[in-house]
């Protein structure tokens, strides 16, 4: 019997306003017109820079404070623009890092999230497991989501991500879960595979795209969850 619903965060409950988690809300305004034009015509190089910068983030993922996160994103943007061979001043990198960490406007929650979670909580515990940074807790709180949750596990607190089964096993222990009684909702089939390996019932969220696999139940929004739960409970 399903009694707990565990969500991923990005792509499931919220999305980056810019369309990219590494492009904060004021990215182009901070860079200025000239640098913005360079980037627009060198998007391939920018993406390569993000890949290189993300390697640094992944290798240094154990952090607990927003101050540590800010310092990490200062280094991240240095790597990105070095990879692009663009001269960006320290003051600009500081502003980008500040915008990436401290500006809640960089994300939007989907319209069904608050009411959807409230409805689900009448019959289920609701939790989040996310590959993320310390500022997520503040973003959740400021958007009225944190107080609705029965549990939150963030990858940065454990230096583990959903790319392996480890973070799911940590969540089982930390949140006292029986994974056989839990749905896990994510927009990444590879994450769902690891969740299933840990014993969770995987559900694929496809907010804006067509499902790339028929291996898992697919939902378009939180209202679709009851039907999935009903079919699982019948089994």
Each predicted region: which residue ranges?
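Asp-based, Mg2+/Mn2+-dependent phosphohydrolase catalytic module
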Residues: 1-7, 87-89, 114, 118, ...
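Active-site neighborhood of HAD-like aspartate-dependent phosphohydrolases
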Residues: 1-51
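Acidic donor-diphosphate engagement hotspot in glycosyltransferases and nucleotidyltransferases
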Residues: 16-18, 112, 132
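A general alpha-helix detector
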Residues: 23-30, 75-80, 135
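Short, well-structured alpha-helical segments
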Residues: 38-51, 90-101, 200
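A metal-dependent, Asp-based hydrolase signature
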Residues: 52-97
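Short amphipathic alpha-helical segments at helix boundaries and their inter-helical linkers
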Residues: 54-68, 104-111, 166, 200-201
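Short, acidic loop-to-helix structural element flanking the phosphoryl-transfer center
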Residues: 71, 88-90, 98-127, 165
